[in-house]
């Protein structure tokens, strides 16, 4: 698999291509469980009515809308993604209190420090080569006591879960993704990117090294998804 700028370009182009089928495929590939996982992530933010949240790698806005639902009509949620087509799809489902911007999750120079109650990234961290900068920026933009939440696909450790995972993600997901989206590379990239991603304990260490404390993580659905949560000191 390509690395560096070439990989970033290919991944960006991939998301542009699959944007219109992205949410349908998420539902098919997870049997709808992604909605449950997203709910867990939203709960972990501790976001209150009227709160402000930043959703990085927001894609078509699935988690962004859930955050807005929790923040309520007086809240504000900013969704940032590097794919124009994913943002175009997100904007087709407008929700009061949400703003979408094209941008880089590792370069939030336009976002004021300490301006958000929570920052989230769901299923996007494994697409970002520089995790140190990602989490340093997420920690910077949340207020003291604010939460940084990362929801990500993982490799399960249990034998039964690992066997199912191997069958599903290595064989069925690429076939299903190719048939529905017409993009074979996109859904062969998915299992490969998960295999290459840092282990959950390692991800927790990266968060701790970049301005976050009380970092915890837990797995869901047999460990195929992990939820990491850290708090900005203060």
Question: How would you name each of these model-derived features?
Answer:
Residues 9, 151, 155-210, 216:
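C-terminal alpha-helical "lid/dimerization" subdomain adjacent to the S-adenosyl-L-methionine
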Residues 49-50, 73-74, 142-147:
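Short glycine-dipeptide loop
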Residues 52-108:
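Class I SAM-dependent methyltransferase SAM/SAH-binding core
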Residues 106-119:
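A short acidic, Gly/Pro-enriched loop at the edge of an enzyme's catalytic core
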Residues 132-144:
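A short glycine-rich, Lys/Arg-flanked "PGG" loop and its adjoining helix->strand segment in the class I
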Residues 211-234:
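Core SAM-dependent methyltransferase catalytic element
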């Amino acid at each position: 698999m390509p690395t560096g700028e070439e990989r970033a370009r290919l991944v960006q182009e991939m998301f542009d291509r699959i944007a219109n089928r992205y949410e349908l495929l998420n539902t098919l590939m997870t049997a709808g469980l992604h909605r449950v996982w997203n709910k867990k992530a939203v709960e972990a933010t501790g976001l209150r009515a009227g709160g402000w949240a930043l959703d990085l790698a927001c894609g078509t806005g699935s988690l962004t809308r859930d955050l807005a639902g929790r923040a309520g009509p007086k809240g504000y949620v900013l969704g940032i993604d590097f794919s124009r087509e994913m943002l175009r799809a997100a904007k087709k489902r407008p929700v009061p209190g949400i703003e979408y911007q094209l941008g880089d999750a590792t370069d939030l120079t336009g976002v004021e420090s300490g301006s958000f109650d929570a920052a989230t990234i769901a299923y996007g961290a494994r697409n970002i080569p520089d995790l140190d900068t990602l989490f340093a920026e997420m920690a910077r933009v949340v207020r003291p006591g604010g939460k940084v939440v990362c929801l990500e696909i993982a490799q399960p450790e249990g034998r039964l879960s690992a066997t199912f995972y191997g069958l599903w993600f290595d064989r069925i997901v690429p076939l299903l993704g190719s048939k529905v989206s017409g993009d074979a590379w996109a859904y062969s990239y998915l299992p490969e990117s998960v295999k290459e991603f840092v282990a959950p304990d390692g991800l927790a260490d990266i968060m701790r090294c970049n301005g976050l404390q009380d970092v915890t993580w837990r797995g869901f659905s047999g460990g195929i998804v992990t939820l990491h949560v850290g708090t900005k000191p203060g």
